[in-house]
């Protein structure tokens, strides 16, 4: 909160020349024809008499939008201080913040977008910047390296101001993800905004510093201030060719104002790069360094982001053949694109005597890159057989070099009766270089630059009794919002594929003989829920019949089905479990020339885990890290916080900063590491939201050596993680578990559907984490998820409680949805007023604080020490009417 106050203080106190406040700064500069020139050598002489247009008439009336606020979803993140507009559609969960405005809202403001509604692309936390101490360093191949203060940038150079349309290279990516999942998240068609930017020319700054000639310096590199979790923990950086940076026709600026106000935190306060006609990924925010160099930027993000790879290239091939480093795959200038905005998604046009008497007006936007003017937009109602030319509106005037940096708007009138006979409408645009849009979508690994025809389906509906209407269906809706004809089409295709590939079990009784021998190739064929075989210490086991009874759920077996899992089995199972396994033994493994040796395989694995890691940046084949439950995912520790003397919050970076973990709510992961030459695996439930991008967080209690006489060695994995240095790798495997919360009270338990309007939750100690995950999911989906939750949380003392602060905050904010009762064995601090229970969780506690069962609408979720569950919780719930087989879900 203090950071937000400090930001407001900075932009109102002294971020500008001493005689100008932010809103008055426009007057200071424009009154002198664009700002007083400090050095005639810094700018072209033909700019002396140029007077920039007064853009205030465009953006001032449109700044009146409802205020941005601190979003509760940001409370537990490093962005808690940043105010954001509530209308923005979040695309990547809580953090980092990536969003776009709803398309109808965006278009309602016309040419200039209010800053609070401008789309946002952040890779990590928003830096807390101080105008008075912020500097931009210019170094490298320059004669006079300088660190400019913001005061020096504002007062030392001629200011320029003009509108620019910014577009993310991932605009319309969700359409690509409906065809095949790319490595990026779901941008809709709203990743575009136009605002008026004020700043200083980059070429003026470079010339002031004595930039060397093109023969010596070929590139200008930019680096931001934010420390990012992915890509080896580097800062965001990229570069431009020197010829672009120094070209007066390109209008590259270092911007410090947007729509007449200082930059907002999400948009780069106090200064950022603006490169008109380029993708947003080249416009570094929170600019700290400019390096003139011979070579391109060495930043991870310069090579591993903003590329269009050929459609046949997946992540594995991209890494193997170094496609990331091929210059022809780099995106700089925007391509030609257009979108239908009217009719809107789910808009209904009634067909009656009134509506058929006048034409319907279709509308939309179009843009192109490199300053190229959009010269024509066409609409078709018959799949491209015929086209109707639209009216174009270009609110901007070209620059003196003939460049167009902004979007334009198109409209066309169509007869309603024509719409009645059409199945879809589509739009395409042309620019002055005669570039146009392809008819069909061209998939690429990163889901970038999608610009196929924008198609809206037309369906007949009955909006009112006895009335016929047309309902319009856009391809997708942004983020995780449902809707769109592409989503429905994908669902139908998936269902048909699933029905066509279902097979009956191939696990047959005659295999149950210990004398049988199998090769590894034969074992690999049994890797499904219909037939799940594993190899442990050279023995082959058919675990198919045990899937439904496994305490950890079927997933724990299925992630290893068809493989030799000796090391993983030993890492997490007791001698008793090994004895139980024998009843499922069907034979022995024989090794052929084409099969590997389990012993050598285990030795090799240990050697690999112990060996120093070679960091090879790569992008995943999927937008989720846990795309294949059978494969371990290498993650790196990027942050570790001590929450108490024995509780740590670990943050691990996923392989790609644009990935989600891919863990369904209710399931957990295995963390794998080699300690003492042996594989150690432990199950943990992340506390980070399933929507988090680029990282996963685990809250873990450390069981130290010699603290508990029953376990003198302490916790092997927890102590290992506590000693793990930043940057060190661990492997994560999953998802694992038999319980999945699908939202709005729906659960899947071992493949069966369950539903509840009320949840009776009981947790003990670290067993709070899966329960916490469900609470988080329910509250995140408000107001759609109306599930009522009652939680009893037991610990030895108050200090042993995990996540209490957040649970209390949720309960206070949602008193009708979440009711919490704590129980401690003893009050650790008698001087503190303890208003909850003391003692053990028994039937009386459960009856007082949980709803009764047996009504078909209440489920119990339980996780904690086995003694607590078996001796008190389960018997108590049974007496309260819960069917322990159907109504009591144990994580």
Swiss-Prot record:
Binding site for heme: 550, 573
Start and end residues of each stretch annotated as Disordered: 1-78
Keyword Transit peptide in record: no
Subunit structure, as described in the record: Homodimer.
Gene Ontology molecular function, alphabetical: FAD binding; heme binding; molybdenum ion binding; molybdopterin cofactor binding; nitrate reductase (NADH) activity; nitrate reductase (NADPH) activity; sulfite oxidase activity
UniProt keywords, alphabetically: Disulfide bond, FAD, Flavoprotein, Heme, Iron, Metal-binding, Molybdenum, NAD, NADP, Nitrate assimilation, Oxidoreductase
Swiss-Prot/TrEMBL catalytic activity: nitrite + NAD(+) + H2O = nitrate + NADH + H(+); nitrite + NADP(+) + H2O = nitrate + NADPH + H(+)
Stated induction or repression of this protein's expression: By nitrate.
GO biological process: nitrate assimilation; nitric oxide biosynthetic process; sulfur compound metabolic process
Protein name: Nitrate reductase [NAD(P)H]
Record: residues binding FAD: 682-685, 699-704, 711, 716-718, 769
EC number, UniProt record: 1.7.1.2
Cofactor: how bound: Binds 1 FAD per subunit. Binds 1 heme group per subunit.
Annotated family: Belongs to the nitrate reductase family.
Keyword Manganese (UniProt): no
All copies of domain FAD-binding FR-type, residue ranges: 630-742
Family matches, as Pfam families: Cyt-b5 (PF00173), FAD_binding_6 (PF00970), Mo-co_dimer (PF03404), NAD_binding_1 (PF00175), Oxidored_molyb (PF00174)
Co-factor requirement: FAD; heme; Mo-molybdopterin
SUPFAM superfamilies given in the database record: Cytochrome b5-like heme/steroid binding domain, E set domains, Ferredoxin reductase-like, C-terminal NADP-linked domain, Oxidoreductase molybdopterin-binding domain, Riboflavin synthase domain-like
Domain Cytochrome b5 heme-binding: 515-590
Biased composition (Basic and acidic residues): 63-76
CDD domains linked: cyt_b5_reduct_like, eukary_NR_Moco
Cellular component terms (Gene Ontology): organelle membrane
Biological source species: Hordeum vulgare (Barley)
């Amino acid at each position: 909160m203090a950071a937000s106050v400090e930001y407001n203080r900075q932009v109102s106190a002294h971020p500008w020349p001493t005689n100008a406040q932010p809103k008055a700064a426009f007057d200071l500069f424009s009154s002198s024809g664009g700002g007083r020139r400090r050095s005639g050598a810094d700018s072209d002489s033909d700019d002396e008499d140029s007077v920039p247009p007064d853009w205030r008439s465009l953006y001032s009336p449109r700044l009146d939008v409802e205020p941005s606020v601190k979003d509760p979803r940001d409370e537990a993140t490093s962005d808690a201080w940043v105010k954001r507009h509530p209308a923005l559609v979040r695309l990547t969960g809580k953090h980092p913040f990536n969003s776009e405005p709803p398309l109808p809202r965006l278009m309602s403001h016309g040419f200039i977008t209010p800053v609070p509604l401008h789309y946002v692309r952040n890779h990590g936390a928003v830096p807390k910047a101080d105008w008075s101490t912020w500097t931009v360093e210019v170094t490298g191949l320059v004669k006079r390296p300088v660190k400019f203060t913001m005061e020096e940038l504002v007062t030392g150079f001629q200011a320029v101001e003009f509108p620019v349309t910014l577009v993310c290279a991932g605009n319309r990516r969700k359409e690509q993800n409906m065809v095949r999942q790319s490595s990026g998240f779901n941008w809709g068609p709203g990743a575009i905004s136009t605002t008026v930017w004020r700043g200083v020319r980059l070429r003026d700054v470079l010339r002031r510093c004595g930039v060397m000639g093109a023969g010596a310096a070929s590139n200008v590199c930019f680096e931001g201030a934010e420390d990012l979790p992915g890509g080896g923990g580097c800062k965001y950086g990229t570069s431009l060719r020197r010829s672009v940076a120094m070209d007066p026709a390109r209008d590259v600026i270092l911007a410090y104002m947007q729509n007449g106000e200082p930059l907002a935190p999400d948009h780069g306060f106090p200064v950022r790069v603006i490169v008109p006609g380029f993708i947003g990924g080249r416009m570094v925010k929170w600019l700290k360094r400019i390096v003139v160099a011979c070579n391109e930027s060495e930043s991870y993000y310069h090579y591993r982001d903003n590329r269009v790879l050929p459609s046949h290239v997946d992540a594995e091939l991209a890494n193997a053949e170094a496609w990331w480093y091929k210059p022809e795959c780099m995106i700089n200038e925007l391509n030609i694109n257009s979108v239908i905005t009217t009719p809107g998604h789910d808009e209904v046009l009634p067909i009656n005597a009134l509506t058929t008497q006048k034409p319907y007006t279709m509308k939309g936007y179009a843009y192109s890159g490199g300053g190229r003017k959009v010269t024509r937009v066409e609409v078709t109602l018959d799949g491209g057989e015929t086209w109707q030319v639209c009216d174009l509106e270009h609110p901007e005037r070209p620059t003196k070099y003939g460049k167009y940096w902004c979007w334009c708007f198109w409209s066309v009138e169509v007869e309603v009766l024509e719409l009645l006979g059409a199945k879809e409408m589509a739009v395409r645009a042309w620019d002055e270089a005669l570039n146009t849009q392809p008819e069909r979508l061209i998939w690429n690994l990163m889901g970038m630059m999608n610009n196929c025809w924008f198609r809206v389906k037309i369906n007949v509906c009955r909006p009112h009794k006895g009335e016929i209407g047309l309902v319009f269906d856009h391809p997708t809706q942004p983020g995780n919002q449902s809707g769109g004809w592409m989503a429905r089409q994908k669902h139908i295709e998936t269902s048909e594929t699933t029905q066509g590939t279902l097979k009956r079990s191939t696990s047959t009784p005659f295999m149950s003989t210990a004398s049988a021998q199998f090769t590894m190739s034969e074992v690999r064929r049994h890797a499904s829920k219909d037939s799940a075989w594993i190899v442990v210490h050279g023995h082959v086991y058919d675990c198919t019949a045990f899937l439904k009874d496994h305490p950890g759920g079927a997933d724990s077996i299925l992630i290893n089905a068809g493989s030799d899992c000796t090391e993983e089995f030993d890492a997490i199972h007791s001698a008793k479990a090994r004895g139980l396994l024998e009843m499922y033994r069907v034979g022995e493994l024989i090794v052929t020339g084409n099969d590997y040796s389990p012993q050598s395989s285990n030795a090799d694995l240990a050697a690999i885990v112990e060996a120093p890691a070679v960091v090879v940046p790569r992008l995943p084949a999927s937008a989720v890290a846990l795309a294949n439950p059978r494969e371990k995912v290498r993650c790196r520790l990027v942050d570790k916080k001590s929450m108490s003397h024995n509780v740590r919050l670990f943050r691990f970076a996923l392989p790609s900063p644009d990935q989600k973990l891919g863990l369904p709510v209710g399931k957990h992961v295995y963390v794998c590491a080699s300690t003492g030459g042996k594989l150690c695996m432990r199950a943990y439930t992340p506390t980070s939201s399933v929507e988090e991008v680029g990282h996963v967080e685990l809250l873990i209690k450390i069981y130290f050596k010699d603290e508990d006489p029953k376990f003198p060695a302490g916790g092997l994995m927890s102590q290992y993680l506590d000693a793990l240095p930043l940057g060190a790798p661990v492997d994560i495997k999953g998802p694992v578990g038999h319980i999945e919360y699908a939202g709005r009270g729906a659960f899947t338990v071992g493949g069966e559907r369950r539903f509840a309007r009320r949840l009776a939750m009981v947790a003990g100690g670290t067993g709070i984490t899966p329960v916490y995950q469900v609470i988080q999911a329910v509250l995140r989906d408000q107001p759609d998820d109306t599930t009522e939750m009652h939680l009893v949380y037991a610990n030895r003392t108050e200090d042993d409680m995990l996540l209490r602060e957040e649970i209390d905050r949720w309960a206070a904010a949602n008193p009708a949805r979440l009711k919490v009762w704590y129980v401690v064995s003893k009050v650790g601090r008698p001087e503190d007023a303890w208003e909850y229970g003391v003692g053990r969780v028994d039937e009386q506690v459960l009856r007082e604080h949980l709803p009764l069962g047996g009504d078909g609408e209440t489920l119990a979720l339980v996780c904690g020490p086995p003694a607590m569950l078996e001796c008190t919780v389960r018997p108590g719930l049974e007496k309260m009417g819960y069917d322990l087989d159907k109504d009591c879900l144990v994580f």
